[in-house]
Amino acid sequence: MDLLNSGLRGSGPWALLAPSPRIIALLARRAGRMNPTMALVETSAGYPPVEEKKPFEEPPAVVVTPSDPWPRPYYLDNGLRRVAPYHFTYNTYCKQRWRGREILDIFSSEFRDRPIEYYKDAMERGAIAVNGKPVESISKIIKNGDVISHTLHRHEPPVTALPISIVHEDEDIIVINKPSGVPVHPAGRYNYNSVVEIMRAERGHGWNPLPCNRLDRLTSGIMFIGKHAKAAEALSLQISGRTVRKEYIARVKGKFPDGEVVCDMPILQISPKLGLNRVRANGKAARTVFKRLAYYPPEQAHDNPEQTELDKTRPPMAKEGYSIVRCLPVTGRTHQLRVHLQFLGHPIGNDPIYCNQRVWGTRLGANDSDATQDTDEDIITRLSRMGKSEVADAVAYHDEMVDEYNKKKAEKMSGELCEVCQTPLYTDPGEQELSLWLHSLRYEDAGGSWSYVSPLPAWALPPDGMDGPTEVGGMEELVEAVKEDNPEIA
């Protein structure tokens, strides 16, 4: 215990990387002793001091950190919140599809973010273990019940340095305005750079934030965080009960029609792995109400003799300017707003999936409910081929954005290696990897007992030299369009 405590405080020479209690118990039973052997990782002598609720101003002076470093090793740089690399141990049981396969084959095919040479080296130096013991051969066969451990030097992607601002707080809940590009929960390459962990770092290691609603990583806006389980459960049930109105703001391509537009097209998930959904007759029922808030024409006329070559290659909708659209989702299907806007011919302008000409062609999937333009297999194949060096033409109507994005995406890997683990390092994310022009603007109880609204994001405000709305009125006109069929939100 003294060893563990001193390691976690960073004041001792070693820190433990412990498996979960369930895995500890399993390994202990197999080994016939109270505790399994755990990996010891050397760590530096400490962390720089940090003010309460304030991230590091400079990178922490650590190269190797414990698996649960505290304070979290955040620092701010170039408008981004970064996490200093740290050692982390993943533990997993053998999955059914892994049974009878060689361990190197499993890692090289299932975890393709690193080359096969890395996994060979990791096995040779004992960073990959099975049932608490180093792998003696890269040809080791994995069987049912095996526990596989992988200790690695973890590099998290940076996220925006914008703060998680508080809209409302009481003894039960916190209402936040989530920045775009920050995932809610730890997932994939993101761990400490998540809403849950950032808020924990600000309020204390023992504090457990409980998200009550869901927002995609790229979506910004209103989120509810429960302070205790009872409050989180009650609010989650209220939201799922469809008596809570939600309003989003989107920036879409072209001039969106006047008046209220109701889209009732069903949505089908055609690729869970890629997170891809399409309008399909055999999909789940979905309904959204849209209303244009503002339209901003392009800065450059179509017949301008000073058009650049890039201007001439832009799709027609891109040359028609863009609209700011209010969105009221009556149902809550995955990617519902993005899919419905695409179907209506006005996809979100920087959507990396549904406004991507390399995937959907120049029509971008508009009014294609029967897959007459492209089959699902065609779309899945094209989306799967989008590699690290490719750029989505979805953003090709802003010269400055395209130039910067091409520079970022053309060299996804920086060409540099980590001095500790020799992992290839990524360049910083471009603007399109940090934001989506979709914002959760408002949540309110249909009975009128509460309502929370966030400010309009910068991309929804009038551009320089143009007039337009800077705030949004009530939801009555949106609700009016569907209240007969959906009285629960009236």
Where are these regions (language model features)?
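RNA pseudouridine synthases
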Residues: 2-490
